[in-house]
Each structure stands twice: as structure tokens, then as C-alpha cells.
């Protein structure tokens, strides 16, 4: 396994990785919605290639982790709206609901962030044992910038227990009514960890 800085030209491959996890849910809305959702999620999470790392081995790209600092921006909103031309109104509304969810929870965690902090915005790994070394390398990069706290949010579609098991403290949780059903709440969780 080789850990290196992520090349933004590979963002479509990251979207395909995301589709293997989150695309299944979106697939209920159609293959094109799943493709656009995962493409948007990947682009929405990438702010700075300097705070984006990857693990590659003989089988290709295996792990990705992105972070952002308060004030960072990207053009994910423009990208997703450029995809709307081929979608129905219902499909566009599905994607806008997802975008609003991402922005709402990001705003919620941003309100909790203290000075000298960053947010882990994306973390996915295909191979067991690859994720933690890549995340640790990103944390080292953040430490070199003087970042003291790492924040993140995740939800019930992810392995949120990973963070509990790796020393992150839960600082909040909530229910997303737009994705909840009568039988099950769609829960999201917020964590932080002192890294410096």
C-alpha cells in the first residue's frame, strides 16, 4: 500500500467507490440519480487536494480521505446543477434533498467547531486495514498546520462505530426526517477528537 496526495483528476473513481456504498440507496431513484448523487458527494467533500490523501496498491485505488478547514470552498454546487439538464423534476428534487441534508448537517457541525479545527469530510476504504493508516497520515498533515481538533459527522449508512472505537467523542446526534420512515429513524452522529 502506498499513501499519497489525492489527484483530483481521479474524482470519478472516488464517485464509483462511493456508489458501492451509498449508490445502492440512491439506486431506488434510478441509475442516473445514483451516479449524480455519488459524483456530487465526492465533489462536495473535496475542498483542497492538500488535505486529500489516498491509498493505492496493486489492485488500484483503495482508500480515500478528505478534510476541510472553515472557510474552504469548492464548486460542487455548480457541478451538480450542470447534471440537472437530463433529469426529471423528481430526480432533481431527490438530489436537492440530498444536497440540503449535507449542507444542513455541515452547518450544524461548523457551529460547534472551535478555532484551529478541521472537518473530516470523506473517508472510504475498500480493504480492511487500509483506512486507519491513511486517516492517520491526514491527521499528521493537519497537525503540521496547527490543527488541534478534528470534527466529523456520519450517519446510519456508515460504519459510525469506527470513530467510537478510535477515540472520537460523540458531541451530538439527530434524526433526518427527510430520510426517516415510520419504522426507522435515519440518524446522524457528530464526533470530535483532539489531535494536537
Predicted regions and their residues:
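Conserved acetyl-CoA-binding loop-helix of GNAT-fold acetyltransferases
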Residues: 127-141
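Conserved active-site alpha-helix within GNAT-family acetyltransferase domains
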Residues: 132, 144, 156-174
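A short beta-loop-alpha structural element at the N-terminal edge
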Residues: 1-16, 27
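Conserved GNAT acetyl-CoA-binding A-motif
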Residues: 117-118, 142-155
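Conserved catalytic-core motifs of GNAT/GCN5-like acyltransferases
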Residues: 151-153, 169-187
